[in-house]
Amino acid sequence: MAKQGQEAMKKAIQNARGAGVGLGLVAAAGAAVYGVAQSMFTVEAGHRAIMFNRIGGLSTDLYKEGLHFRIPWFQYPIIYDIRARPNQIRSPTGSKDLQMVNIGLRVLSRPNPEHLVHIYRTLGQNWEERVLPSICNEVLKGVVAKFNASQLITQRQQVSMLVRKTLIERALDFNIILDDVSLTELAFSPQYSAAVEAKQVAAQEAQRATFYVERAKQQKQEKIVQAEGEAESAKLLGEAMKNDPGFLKLRKIRAAQKIARIVSESGNKTYLPTGGLMLNIADTDYLNVTDKRR
């Protein structure tokens, strides 16, 4: 019995040793897999990475898109998104004539990939929040202060170009690239807007009054010309009647011819006496006039 117990103990010890070896192998394999996984990192498209070393600090190497290796627990990557991202910034500021202006700005910004190490040391990874609001407000206040409120409306394109140029140059001081800068909003205080509207209404009323005055002058001139023409016509007609008694008879004949032509072209048959045609053929004056015309 004692021998059987000893043999059983030996078998149990051997089995335990075998199980321990198996567990050790599994643990070693798991650690190896974990180590390999931790030694690799991927840089996605549109991103760049820099490496921090626990011993030497930041490395100047720049890691582009793709799969890269590192020393686990000693090195870890810092990945930056270098794609342009939109930022909306609004700033209340004052114009040259001390009018309050609310300006909205849309900025497409991205970090300079060649200076990611310096950006991380000075600004960290939230560089947009640290830089863009301050420099945008600074540039907007400086540019808007050069223009009157009315010039901000009439010269908006020039204002936008000046803001763009100044802001791009200012952002380069922080190694930030601005791909686009555009004014999206330009609003004034309610009091100024009401004053501008009243001024426009007054200008329209003045233009309307000027139009009415010019039209009245033209109508007056037309009446003067018409009256002068009628007076000249009456004068000539009077002289003709005075110098030639048959002139009136001739006008009667022409009027009668016109009436006769109209009546003849009508579908209705109408008979008019000579008196109805303003003619009196039996009149001796008529005969004398016709003889003279012959």
Swiss-Prot record:
It comes from Caenorhabditis elegans. One of its GO terms (cellular component) is cell surface. It is a single-pass type II membrane protein. Residues 212-237 form a coiled coil. SUPFAM superfamilies: Band 7/SPFH domain. Gene3D superfamilies: Band 7 domain. It is found in: Mitochondrion inner membrane. One of its GO terms (biological process) is gonad development. The chain crosses the membrane at residues 20-42. This is Mitochondrial prohibitin complex protein 2.
